[in-house]
UniProtKB/Swiss-Prot annotation:
Cellular component per GO, a single term: cytosol
Similarity comment: family membership: Belongs to the class-I aminoacyl-tRNA synthetase family.
Enzyme Commission number: 6.1.1.4
SUPFAM superfamilies named in the record: Anticodon-binding domain of a subclass of class I aminoacyl-tRNA synthetases, Nucleotidylyl transferase, ValRS/IleRS/LeuRS editing domain
HAMAP family per record: Leu_tRNA_synth_B (MF_00049_B)
Binding of ATP, residues: 578
Protein name per Swiss-Prot or TrEMBL: Leucine--tRNA ligase
Organism of derivation: Listeria monocytogenes serotype 4a (strain HCC23)
Subcellular location: Cytoplasm
Amino acid sequence: MTFNHKKMEPKWQQYWSEHNTFKTTEDKNKENFYALDMFPYPSGAGLHVGHPEGYTATDILSRMKRMQGKNVLHPIGWDAFGLPAEQYAIDTGNDPEEFTALNIANFTRQIKSLGFSYDWDREINTTDPEYYKWTQWIFEKLYENGLAYEAEIAVNWCPALGTVLANEEVIDGKSERGGFPVFRKPMRQWMLKITAYADRLLDDLDLVDWPENIKDMQRNWIGRSEGAEVTFKIKDSDETFNVFTTRPDTLFGATYTVFAPEHELIEKITTPEQKEAVEAYKKQVELKSELERTDLAKDKTGVFTGAYAINPINGEEVPIWIADYVLIQYGTGAIMAVPAHDERDFEFAQQFGLNIRPVLEGGDVTKEAFTGDGPHINSDFLNGLAKAEAITAAIDWLEKEGIGSRKITYRLRDWLFSRQRYWGEPIPVIHWEDGETTLVPEDELPLLLPKATEIKPSGTGESPLANLHDWVNVTDENGRKGRRETNTMPQWAGSSWYFLRYIDPKNSEAIADKEKLAEWLPVDVYIGGAEHAVLHLLYARFWHKFLYDIGVVPTKEPFQKLFNQGMILGENNEKMSKSRGNVVNPDEVVEKYGADTLRLYEMFMGPLEASIAWNENGLEGARKFLDRIWRLLVTEEGTLAEKVTTDANANLEKAYHHMVKTVTNHYENLRFNTGISQLMIFINEAYKQDTIPKQYVEGFVQLLSPIAPHLAEELWEILGHTETISYVAWPTYDETKLVEDEVEIVLQVNGKVKSKITVAKSLGKEELEKIAQEDNKMKENLEGKTIRKVIVVPGKLVNIVAN
């Protein structure tokens, strides 16, 4: 006997919708709980089975917290700007807005079919002008506070496509789409000064409950380094250049220097005989993306400029090379190379026959770089010193000589904020003919994205908005002509603050009401994929800290607890993808097995953070368990089974209280697979009984409801209730019912186990000895033997020594 999910699930989804069951309560007498999902990009492909894993986890918490008497904010929305919709529009001539709306409608249908308890009144969409009005407002505040500025930045320019490409869209110097050549070209771009927040972004990681690996990824991305900036003179020239190093103590081992190919001094210092080679090399580098240039696995390339620098600590002449692995935007765009103690410098020195001088004892630098620590050698006044003392001594010397100073640098660069795209938030800026740049007045926001009948690249490197002359060209009241900014914001913009808008999504006067922000922030739990570990989470923290500084939000950090669910892989353990043809569509699973089965299966697959392969058998197993519950509690006629009675049943008492305690604990700690195991254990116990107390059945159904809400609502109704289960007080347990009053005692003869008995915990030594000697198996083993000694350990064992 089985239940009909095709009738049951739509029935309860309709009930929740008509009764607005999951509308966020804002009762001042209750505690608040904010459970947030990383909102999806509504792609044309729709949901895949990976999406519901994180969504089910937050839904379980949300449903449990409502039953525990909390106000719960559990919202959903759409991160709907972005490249795929624009590409689709360029390829098909369709409107990206219409395409996005269709995709959102499909995602909404799919999400509702899975029974998630979202408050749909709070739905947001980053492409809605009433939403992006506030994205633009935040940009204006950043600009007013000196944190948004324009700069000439080298971008990936593809003449054939007439557009600028992101690093990810360039493969081996060619466009991912079409395989056209891509060049590095300087263009004016908007930048956000995230570096101003580097220290706070680093230090405040200590305030949040996040996975340590994610914190480490952010720390590495920010990359705070303490060291020294050292000035090198160029031989036979008045020019100097600076390098930053974390190891100024190894200066005696610096045997050459390397410039980024874009370094401004190259032009001036290259000798006539090296000019041709240097120019050819620079052209070659133009075709490479940053990722390719810094790939550790690739062969080192470079070229000698013909010029020499003077090592400031020992006066030696050292050659100046250029190489692609040095990037102009990191540090000073020049490095001092210590090949004896740095793997990359060692490989480069070997490739080009450059001098390798060890300055730390240990290792064999004829074979490989020694990157460990040891006392200093070949280092004059630093000889014999350990690392920390030597660094201090070297910096003191540099500062005394006036050729260096202590310095802190960051790997973090300012955020390149403009995109040469149509489908994004317009940047609310006007460039006037007299050179002034102004913001669109705040009372004129939102600056609407204009409709375009045809979206095509401008051909100049500007966005397709540059083609819309009526929109771009403006005149002020004094007849001064200007042009609107044609770049749009990156997709990261709308997702950097969306969690604030959910708190007060209809507010037309502010991002959200201050009191409401104070009540709901920070987000209690944020669940999503680890692929957003750095960029999204770092950008959102940056914007949040800025909004904190200008008094908009009341907390320093946006997300108190972060959890990354694992990836659901294809049956063959490969990542699910269209090209592999192994994507599982949740629609098909819901049709065949039901949404509750899908939810149960995804939570039972393994630990939430693990990446696990999809398995159809596991899905069938999940459905069988739900059918087993149904058969235990419901008759063929759909009424409550006769074995469910109001009578007590001492045999189930301990199992019930143990289940309530452990399931609650496991849900709280996101250990859903072990929580489900406890539900299964209880059902196994219940099957062995002639009667099951109705109170225990009700408690069980409540514990099941966050995982399988449709089935739980149906069972709740069969149990005689007329209201939804969603707000019924969460079951409680009695600790005294869990105390063990019996223990298992091992009975041994000469140290070998012969029998086991269960006795009252309170029995003393004499009683245990007596029971042991009367045990039938012990009698058999003692026959014909003389008892020499009896060892009794109460609560554990009785060992009889006999011969």
